[in-house]
Amino acid sequence: MSMSDPIADMLTRIRNAQMVEKVSVTMPSSKVKVAIAQVLKDEGYIDDFAVKSEGAKSELNIVLKYYAGRPVIERIERVSKPGLRVYRGRNDIPVVMNGLGVAIVSTPKGVMTDRKARATGVGGEVICYVA
């Protein structure tokens, strides 16, 4: 059976792995998932990630980050879903926790944070909030 929302599955795997204090989490890979992982790494929410290809299937392995025994990601929440897509213009991109968190946005110029999208002057689909 096919998965209806692979990005929500990725976020749930990260959330569940951090609740049981796993070092890393593995999931099926895609270009969008790798782009989201890159944003999470650039923002300091994860330590590292790697894509392992075996034949036709590739897997994304994310090394999770903890500080003082607690997960760095306190909240990770899907915003735009397959049943209800959420698009925002460059002036309407939300601010998460007054700038302490980030909104990950898929724009025509690639997947980026809300701050970078505002600075670049582009809007797009709000994928998730991370805090």
Curated annotation (Swiss-Prot):
Listed GO MF terms: rRNA binding; structural constituent of ribosome
Biological processes annotated in GO: translation
GO cellular component terms, semicolon-separated: ribonucleoprotein complex; ribosome
Keyword presence, Lipid metabolism: no
Keywords: Ribonucleoprotein, Ribosomal protein, RNA-binding, rRNA-binding
Subunit annotation: Part of the 30S ribosomal subunit. Contacts proteins S5 and S12.
Function: One of the primary rRNA binding proteins, it binds directly to 16S rRNA central domain where it helps coordinate assembly of the platform of the 30S subunit.
Similarity comment: Belongs to the universal ribosomal protein uS8 family.
Protein name: Small ribosomal subunit protein uS8
Gene behind this protein: rpsH
